[in-house]
Amino acid sequence: MKSIKLFYDKILNNIEKINPHLYRFLTYNLYKIYSEIANSIKYKDKYFFHSVSLEISTYCNRKCHYCPNKDYETPKNFMSWDIFKLAIAQLKDIKYTGIVQYHLFNEPLFDERLTDFVRYTSTHLPKAIQVLISNGDLLNIEKAKELSEAGINKFVVTVHDTNPERNLERLKPVKEFLKEKMRLQTSNELYLASRGGAADIEKEKRKTDFKKCPDIRTLIICYNGDIILCCQDYFKKYIMGNIMEKSILEIWNSYKDIREKLLRDNITELPICKICLKRE
């Protein structure tokens, strides 16, 4: 299954070179269809999470114009090894084979334990696809090789400068080394969301107005073990539970009705969702 996903990803990378818009469409829609079919069979739930984001730390070195970090100082908190291992163990219990990422609003490369985390995930979730989302400021060939060997399957690096040419040039050798494993983009290519109202992006050109939430099917595990509603909940107002008190599966199923209303019925009830999906 993992080899099929990676082969599919390789094809999409080639499509992106020809037509970036088609790439975005296929990335979202084809993977959505595939994951819904697979999860319906495996978990009897078409909306089961296909991606997990582990907030291994809260620190980011950037103050990007579209991110709430530019307006708020975030304390430097780090996920403990005990919580990390518990999260991986619970994912292993349900035979999880989806995507594992190491970010929320943080820059993963600033955590010196990242390679060890990746290696641990590779050992205990060998069929999962590990993705590094990064601003690339600390990424070089040596670090890319280290992380790739530890188990990172895909590097997605976004250059956040207003004039990104310099950093794009700096990262070219890394891209040449990683080849199809790395997706290099600028912040101009991102879809912008208001982070549930925490970021003011009205002055920016929003790339997409989503009819349905694209993020509610990602499981977010915060540094302290809290599971929050989605990756747009910057202030962590909607805490669904904590993995040290209940299992991931119990917590995920506890707000199934919210997901189904959003994804199946297109009904938006929570204030954060109304703001994010522009339905105020």
Language-model region placement:
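C-terminal accessory region of radical SAM enzymes
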Residues: 2, 6, 10-13, 173-203, ...
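Conserved alpha-helical substructure of the radical SAM core
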Residues: 5-155
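Processing junctions and N-termini across compartments
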Residues: 54, 58-61, 207, 267-270
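Short cysteine clusters
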Residues: 60, 64-67, 213, 230-231, ...
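Secreted/processed peptides and extracellular or luminal domains of membrane proteins
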Residues: 66, 70-73, 219, 236-237, ...
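Conserved AdoMet/S-adenosylmethionine-binding subsite of the radical SAM
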Residues: 111-217
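Short, acidic, Ser/Thr-enriched surface-loop or helix-capping motifs
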Residues: 221-224
